[in-house]
């Protein structure tokens, strides 16, 4: 019966995703469905409600953090910080390195802002605009944008995904980042080589005519983005603060508050906003003034309510599943995979299955954690495994919002996922490394047994 209920839930999630229904509605329906299953199995409604609330309590801090991130992104837009970064880096997109530059610039933006969607809409849009006019197929550019946009989603100190993983595993984002950097170093280098190689093979902007046209498009793109903003090097202060405080491994609330507060001051001093306008932008998001680029609109607490609601509702599942033992069969299968191929393979399998069904990165992370919990006893390693699987695999599923939204923002087709090299290389590389390590461990155990 549990399998049938899970099948109905998966079908509802997939159908709602294809029909464009907000994810929160099938999630709410799933909560009632799972409560009904528990009641049919003889579990009390009050006991299940208590279990659900206890699991919600574990993500209480992250919900507040989501709101702080909304404030940060609004203030970075209002202060001109994002505009300034785009303005000074857009000139890198030229010639055969255009795909590599697109990937690297989106990596930089996503690391600083912690948002894949925001990166795709700002830096991704500009890079796609320049690349398309240079004759680069949007199919390839979309892969570079998608790859770079999720670089920061995985390892940024202000990433909601990283924070969710840390909360679920009982670890700390600042302490997790060094391990994430190490595990992604080789995939990152390989992705850079592939993007550079494709640019060279295509001969992007190789002739003089293309170079002249590309230079003109860069100027137009930068001018459109920067129009109406008073840009000075001071706009970099919020980004420098976030990076510096992250290196000191301070609490994420302190990092976010410092980044948002410094940007709010710049919005008033450099962009001429008043205090009520800043306060309103913190709540509803930044609304560009006449003459400013509409690409900068967004952010604010309101922008985070959707993902916060998804996390809030889906967090109840953990308590319900634990109370009703609904996932015991699936969990046993995942543990069998871990016993045969190692914990990373098990986490990757669970995360991939969740990503295909759930259509939501947040839900993939939470259910992937639920299914593979116990496969890796070390909390730090388990957090790293979730980062190397659930966080990036979600963006490779064409019908997932994690994939569809960034690609739609730059006008790229779903097939661009095949050229999102970084997102494929992170789980593939680490799977290979962990399989070798697991086999060596088994071999050593056999020798010791003799």
Give names to the regions the model predicted.
Residues 8, 26, 30-34, 38, ...:
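Alpha-helical transmembrane segments in multi-pass membrane proteins
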Residues 37-46, 131-138, 155-159, 266-278, ...:
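Juxtamembrane membrane-interface segments at transmembrane alpha-helix termini
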Residues 95-182, 350-388:
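Hydrophobic transmembrane alpha-helices that form the pore/transport pathway of multi-pass ion
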């Amino acid at each position: 019966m549990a399998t049938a209920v899970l099948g109905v839930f998966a079908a509802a999630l997939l159908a709602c995703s294809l029909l464009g229904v907000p994810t929160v509605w099938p999630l709410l329906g799933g909560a009632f469905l799972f409560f009904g299953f528990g009641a049919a199995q003889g579990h009390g409604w009050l006991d299940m409600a208590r279990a659900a609330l206890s699991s919600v309590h574990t993500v209480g801090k992250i919900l507040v953090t989501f709101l702080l991130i909304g404030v940060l992104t609004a203030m970075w837009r209002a202060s001109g910080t994002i505009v300034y970064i785009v303005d000074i880096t857009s000139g890198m997109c030229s010639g055969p390195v255009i795909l590599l530059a697109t990937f690297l610039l989106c990596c930089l933006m996503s690391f600083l802002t912690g948002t894949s969607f925001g990166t795709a809409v700002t830096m991704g849009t500009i890079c796609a605009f320049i690349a398309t006019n240079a004759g680069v197929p949007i199919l390839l550019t979309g892969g570079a944008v998608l790859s770079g946009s999720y670089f920061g989603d995985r390892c940024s100190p202000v990433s909601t995904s990283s924070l969710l993983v840390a909360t679920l595993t009982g670890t700390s984002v600042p302490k997790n980042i060094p391990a994430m950097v190490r595990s992604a170093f080789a995939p990152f280098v390989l992705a850079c080589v592939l993007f550079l190689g494709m640019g060279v093979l295509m001969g992007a902007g190789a002739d003089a005519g293309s170079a002249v046209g590309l230079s003109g498009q860069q100027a137009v793109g930068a001018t459109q983005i920067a129009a109406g903003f008073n840009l000075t090097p001071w706009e970099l202060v919020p980004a420098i603060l976030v990076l510096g405080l992250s290196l000191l491994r301070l609490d994420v609330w302190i990092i976010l508050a410092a980044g948002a507060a410094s940007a709010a001051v710049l919005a008033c001093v450099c962009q001429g906003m008043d205090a009520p306008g800043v306060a309103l932008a913190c709540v509803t998001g930044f609304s560009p003034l006449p003459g400013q680029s509409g690409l900068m609109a967004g952010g604010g607490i309101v922008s985070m309510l959707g993902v916060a609601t998804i996390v809030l509702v889906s967090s109840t599942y953990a308590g319900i599943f634990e109370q009703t033992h609904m996932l015991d069969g699936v969990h046993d299968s995942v543990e069998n995979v871990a016993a045969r191929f190692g914990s990373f393979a098990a986490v990757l399998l669970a995360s991939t299955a969740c990503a295909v069904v759930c259509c939501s990165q947040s839900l993939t992370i939470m259910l992937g954690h639920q299914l593979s919990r116990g496969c890796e006893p070390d909390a730090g390693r388990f957090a790293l495994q979730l980062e190397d699987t659930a966080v990036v695999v979600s963006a490779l599923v064409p019908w997932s919002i994690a994939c569809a939204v960034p690609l739609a923002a730059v006008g790229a087709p779903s097939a661009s996922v095949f050229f999102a090299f970084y997102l494929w290389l992170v789980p593939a590389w680490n799977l290979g490394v962990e399989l070798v390590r697991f086999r060596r461990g088994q071999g050593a155990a056999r020798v010791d047994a003799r």
